[in-house]
Regions:
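Periplasmic-binding protein-like
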Residues: 1-11, 34, 72, 76-134, 136-154
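Short helices/loops that flank or line small-molecule/ion binding pockets
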Residues: 19-20, 40, 54-69, 73, ...
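Loop/turn elements at helix/coil->beta-strand transitions in domains of secreted/extracellular proteins
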Residues: 23-24, 43-46, 84
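Flexible hinge/capping segments at coil-to-helix
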Residues: 9-26
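Short beta-strand-to-loop elements that line the ligand-binding cleft
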Residues: 28, 45-53
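Secondary-structure junction motif
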Residues: 27-41, 110, 128
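Conserved functional loop/turn residues at catalytic and ligand-binding sites
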Residues: 25, 49, 64, 124, ...
Length: 154
């Protein structure tokens, strides 16, 4: 799966561009990619930092911040479960991937997995799997191409 940062905010004050966060309070969890990204790239955005994701989401629900940022895979699913909130920025920062892992030095398994990913990509397996298992989580409006890696190629 592809993953980047996402930003979720209340529908009544929807954040659709990172520049809209200037002078506003953005909720993040401590020690996360979101915290580091905003500290390094947008120091003018005030960060409200929480120890856990649960505390961060509760802070957004309680209005202690203007928006919340974490992995887009999380905020997209959370917004569906919480009417009145929308992900206005679906992809921010570097695009990363979530991949299978093997023990260092296990070239046989690594090569087999890589070959299988390519073969399955030729069948559009990962898009079909997304539709079968994750479509409900991310909703009808989510773009599968923004989350799915097919054949190991971004």
């Amino acid at each position: 799966m592809k993953v980047a940062l996402g930003v979720v905010s209340p529908d009544g004050a929807l954040i659709t561009d990172v520049e809209q966060l200037n002078g506003k309070t953005l909720i993040v969890s401590k020690g996360t990619t979101a915290e580091t990204f905003f500290e390094q790239n947008y120091p003018e955005v005030k960060l409200a930092k929480y120890d856990s994701y649960t505390e961060a989401y509760i802070a957004l629900l309680d209005g202690r911040g203007d928006a919340l940022s974490t992995d887009n895979t999380e905020v997209l699913a959370w917004a569906i479960e919480n009417p009145g909130f929308t992900v206005g920025i679906e992809s921010l920062g570097s695009l990363d991937t979530i991949n299978p892992a093997v023990s260092q030095g296990n070239e046989t398994l690594l090569n087999w997995i890589n070959e299988e990913i390519v073969k399955l990509g030729e069948e559009n397996f990962f898009h079909a799997d997304y539709e079968a298992t994750l479509r409900e989580t991310y909703g009808e409006n989510a773009d599968a191409d923004s989350l799915v890696v097919e054949g190991g190629v971004i």
